Regions:
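Pyridoxal 5′-phosphate
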Residues: 1-139
């Protein structure tokens, strides 16, 4: 498994120990996944009926925390079960976000629930664009 992760990204030019290749590969993979997540956040943020769950607005500008490559969102007026079914029908893997008191306080239940999307090294920019098109068809 370690060798697989060490070989995910080509182009390493340093001392080719497995440890160095693994660090290079994981750093590059992290940057790639964060880019996909940021693009998804940006594109979904342009859809008026979509509410992205989490830190946003002025609070996000000062947030200097690293985030994992996943995002939860809801579509106002569309139950999360409907969003999930549409995503799955279009070949997009997602999960329904479980209700919690915190999410209830954030208004997630009021908008019909939320779904969560997680990025993997095998996702592409095309996957992000397909996801956004699918969500836009609901909004």
């Amino acid at each position: 498994v370690v060798d697989h992760y060490a070989s995910l990204v080509e182009g390493f030019t340093g001392r080719a120990t497995r440890r160095n290749r693994l660090k290079y590969s994981l750093d590059a993979t992290t940057a790639y996944l964060n880019g996909l997540r940021d693009d998804l956040h940006t594109f979904l943020g342009t859809l008026p009926a979509v509410h992205i769950v989490g830190v946003s607005g002025e609070a996000a500008e000062d947030a200097r925390v690293e985030r994992i490559p996943r995002l939860a969102f809801g579509v106002t007026g569309v139950p999360s079960e409907t969003v999930l079914r549409r995503l799955l029908a279009n070949g997009i893997v997602a999960t329904q976000t479980c209700a919690t008191p915190l999410l209830d306080d954030m208004g997630v239940a009021d908008m019909g629930g939320a779904v969560t999307i997680a990025m993997s090294p095998f996702n592409t920019q095309n996957d992000i664009e397909q996801l956004v098109r699918t969500v836009a068809s609901l909004a």
